[in-house]
Amino acid sequence: MPQMAPINWLILFIVFSITLVVFNILNYFCFFYTPLKTSQSLNIKFNKLNWKW
């Protein structure tokens, strides 16, 4: 069974690296973050305590 030539491994590594970088760039820049309205959705009641020492 013949082995792959080193230039073939190099091309395979370069293609894999370029694919990985392009995939990561597309995932990073194509992410649309839509934050929820935190003031309306969260109703947190705070108890204001006046400490008398």
Curated annotation (Swiss-Prot):
Keyword Mitochondrion present in the record's keywords: the answer is: yes
The way it spans or sits in the membrane comes to: Single-pass membrane protein
Q: Which GO terms describe its biological process?
A: proton motive force-driven ATP synthesis
Ordered alphabetically, the record's keywords are:
ATP synthesis, CF(0), Hydrogen ion transport, Ion transport, Membrane, Mitochondrion, Transmembrane, Transmembrane helix, Transport
Q: Does the keyword tRNA processing apply?
A: no
Q: How does it assemble?
A: F-type ATPases have 2 components, CF(1) - the catalytic core - and CF(0) - the membrane proton channel.
Briefly state the protein's biological role.
Answer: Mitochondrial membrane ATP synthase (F(1)F(0) ATP synthase or Complex V) produces ATP from ADP in the presence of a proton gradient across the membrane which is generated by electron transport complexes of the respiratory chain. F-type ATPases consist of two structural domains, F(1) - containing the extramembraneous catalytic core and F(0) - containing the membrane proton channel, linked together by a central stalk and a peripheral stalk. During catalysis, ATP synthesis in the catalytic domain of F(1) is coupled via a rotary mechanism of the central stalk subunits to proton translocation.
What is this protein's record name? ATP synthase protein 8
The record lists the organism as Anopheles gambiae
Its taxonomic path starts at: Eukaryota, Metazoa, Ecdysozoa, Arthropoda, Hexapoda
Q: Which gene encodes it?
A: mt:ATPase8
